[in-house]
Amino acid sequence: MSLRTSPLSSAHEALGARLVDFGGWEMPLSYPSGTVAEHLACRRSAAVFDVSHLGTVRVEGPGSFEVLQGELSNDLRKIAPGRAQYTHLLNDEGGVLDDIIVWWVSDDRFDVMPNASNTDRVVSRIGGTDVTTERAVIAVQGPGAREIVARVSEEAARVPHFGVSGFDFGGVPCLVAGTGYTGEDGVECAVPVDAAVSLWQAILDAGATPAGLGARDTLRLEAGLPLHGHELAPDITPLEAGLGWVVGWNKEAFTGRQALDIIRQRGGPARRLAGLLTDQRRPPREGDPVLSEGRTVGSVTSGNYSPVLERGIALAFVPSSTPNGETVEIDLRGKPTAAEVVKPPFHRMHPSSRAARP
């Protein structure tokens, strides 16, 4: 099966990007500068990412609110038109089928943003129209992100954290949300395909560093943000992942609610997601066993080298009774390596990014 391509593919090729298969899409993993340099550019100034592989499912018309309120875990009554919300699509057992950002664009229009490989699954549950191929999504992230975006569109740069608004780019109507997946301030712009390359180039010309999905992953890991298929999955609940705040406990009903209620009534989940901080540069990897007193108590779900901390870091599920500050061991390909159990994030996130999305 051929890979789907981003509207920005030609721009990535011109920049010498290393392109890889990501969820059925050919996307840039990195550029010639390399993942570490791209990561640090985002932490220190601003980086621009192509995230067009993320789906967009448009749900609109009368009854749209009620459909989403009944299918998604979070409570849309917490927000209003012109706002975005992080939420989950759950199965009957309370497991996470996908984690999603909902852009509430106007009274009866919602743009639901699932992960690349889960768009069809989301459409089958909530209905709506898959408009992924009609637009590109460009994320500008970092402490200098808004300053750079303002050089292209002051209107887009003014969008508040988790706000959603329209902006004009060269006469083309676009959408922007104050969302991201890096632990930094920033925005994500949805732009019609025909204007995508022009907007990308304008952001580069304004001073942003192009960054690939490799840097996006190390950034989200430093920020302690979960990735579906790793820290979230159909057999992992929001409660295990430390995301109970994504559950609308005051809602009357939604798929998976009963299972989550039972877990709470039993005193909570048996395992929890924790951070693991090593004192070595060698990175833990997914699947590495986590041991306590010689006994396997969990496994790494995501691990990598932290360019900011200059050491290996990981996320892992451990028994809920495991306290922060305890020392465990990670079996790093046959080499026991000490790690401290810590509460993510590993990197101090920008104050406006503490609820940022995967």
What do the PLM-derived regions correspond to, one by one?
Residues 75-122:
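Well-ordered mid-protein domain cores that form the structural environment of catalytic cofactors
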Residues 1-90, 95, 214:
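Acidic, proline/glycine-enriched N-terminal capping motif
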